[in-house]
């Protein structure tokens, strides 16, 4: 099977760089599956799990993204995520606590800046929890 190069980066770090046979991203209108030689595309992605099928590996690489942009070219995909964390690095207790803290901050927000920051923190926590949920369902 042919492959494409995938880059997933956040503002803080490069999260994934390598070849992939297939990628599924949480698109604005639902999941978006991309194979090599896909037509060029630029789209927004929403919070959720990004799934990358790596050649020669039985398990997909899972990355929680809190939103961002994805550029698709026939032989490459670049995901520019607001925040991204590899699924195997997510701490469930921390993500649950972050979600509760963000919900509380959203309720207490007094201006647009505080509201935007709380919404971004909530998106990040929800994306991590969705990725963990996907990983659990995949195992069972």
From Swiss-Prot:
**Protein name, as recorded:** ATP synthase epsilon chain
Family stated for the protein in its record: Belongs to the ATPase epsilon chain family.
Location in the cell: Cell inner membrane
Q: Where does the UniProt annotation place the signal sequence?
A: none
The cross-references to InterPro entries, in alphabetical order and at most eight, read: ATP_F1_dsu/esu_C_sf, ATP_synth_F1_dsu/esu, ATP_synth_F1_dsu/esu_N, ATP_synth_F1_esu_C, ATPsynth_dsu/esu_N
> Mainly resides where?
membrane
The UniProt function text for this chain reads: Produces ATP from ADP in the presence of a proton gradient across the membrane.
Coiled-coil spans in chain: none
Which membrane topology term applies here? Peripheral membrane protein
Annotated GO molecular function terms are: ATP binding; proton-transporting ATP synthase activity, rotational mechanism
Question: What quaternary structure, including any partners, is listed in this protein's UniProt entry?
Answer: F-type ATPases have 2 components, CF(1) - the catalytic core - and CF(0) - the membrane proton channel. CF(1) has five subunits: alpha(3), beta(3), gamma(1), delta(1), epsilon(1). CF(0) has three main subunits: a, b and c.
Q: Which organism is it from?
A: Laribacter hongkongensis (strain HLHK9)
* Gene Ontology cellular component list: plasma membrane; proton-transporting ATP synthase complex
Keywords from the named record: ATP synthesis, Cell inner membrane, Cell membrane, CF(1), Hydrogen ion transport, Ion transport, Membrane, Transport
Record keyword Lyase present:
no
Q: Where are the transmembrane segments?
A: none
């Amino acid at each position: 099977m042919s492959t494409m190069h995938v880059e997933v980066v956040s503002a803080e770090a490069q999260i994934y760089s390598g070849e992939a046979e297939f990628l599924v991203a949480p698109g604005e209108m639902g999941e978006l599956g991309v194979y090599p030689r896909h037509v060029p595309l630029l789209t927004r992605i929403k919070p959720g799990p990004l799934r990358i099928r790596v050649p020669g590996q039985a398990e997909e690489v899972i990355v929680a993204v809190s939103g961002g942009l994805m550029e698709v070219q026939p032989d490459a995909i670049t995901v520019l995520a607001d925040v991204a964390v590899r699924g195997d690095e997510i701490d469930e207790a921390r993500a649950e606590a972050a979600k509760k803290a963000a919900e509380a901050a959203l309720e207490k927000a007094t201006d647009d800046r505080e509201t935007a920051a709380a919404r971004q923190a909530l998106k990040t926590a929800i994306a991590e929890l969705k990725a963990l949920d996907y990983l659990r369902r995949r195992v069972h």
